[in-house]
Amino acid sequence: MSDAEDIPTGRKRRPREQTPVQRALGLLVRREHSRKELTRKLTARGIEDEAAQAAVAKLTEAGWQDDTRFAENLVRMRANTGYGPIHVRAELGTHGLDSAAIAAAMDSYEGDWQENARDLVRRRFGEAGPQDLTQRRKAADLLARRGFDGDSIRRATRYDPDD
């Protein structure tokens, strides 16, 4: 053997390629994902569709991935950041959840959507709320963009568009 072969090259070992289950688990450790979202992310990272679905199924069986838990967390998180039930329901639909799971998640929310609308208006317009018609319209537009229904908007802004 020559001396050149005995000298370490200083190169680091390449890390082993992660399995689809390991990659999916890495995503789930960061935050909850729906089955559809997790499968989509795995296939986007170059994992074959069948392998991605098998990995997600294995993690679902083991309790690491749960669409019900994901939906309940999303409802709570969006409600706490000022979004209304219409927006939240639509977002849950984009994550591939069926209507029964969406309804169950919305029913599990223990907060009050109208109180959330009032809180959002208070944060934007002060404790007294919107005073004149222009401010009430702006508050109503804000709540509508955030996904609140008409009844919640009227109660939170004391604004009736027929005035």
From Swiss-Prot:
- Keyword Cytoplasm listed? The answer is yes
Per UniProt, the keywords (alphabetical) are: Cytoplasm
- For the region Disordered, what residue ranges are annotated? 1-21
Pfam families listed in its UniProt record = RecX_HTH1, RecX_HTH2, RecX_HTH3
Q: Which domain of life is it from?
A: Bacteria
Keyword check for Transmembrane helix, yes or no. Answer: no
For biological process, the GO terms are: regulation of DNA repair
Q: Name one GO cellular component term.
A: cytoplasm
InterPro entries from the UniProt entry:
RecX_HTH_1st, RecX_HTH_2nd, RecX_HTH_3rd, Regulatory_RecX, WH-like_DNA-bd_sf
Where in the cell? Cytoplasm
For this chain, the annotated S-S bridges are none
Its job: Modulates RecA activity.
Q: Which PANTHER family match?
A: REGULATORY PROTEIN RECX FAMILY PROTEIN (PTHR33602:SF1)
Family of the protein in this entry: Belongs to the RecX family.
Under what name is this protein listed?
A: Regulatory protein RecX
Give the originating organism: Stenotrophomonas maltophilia (strain K279a)
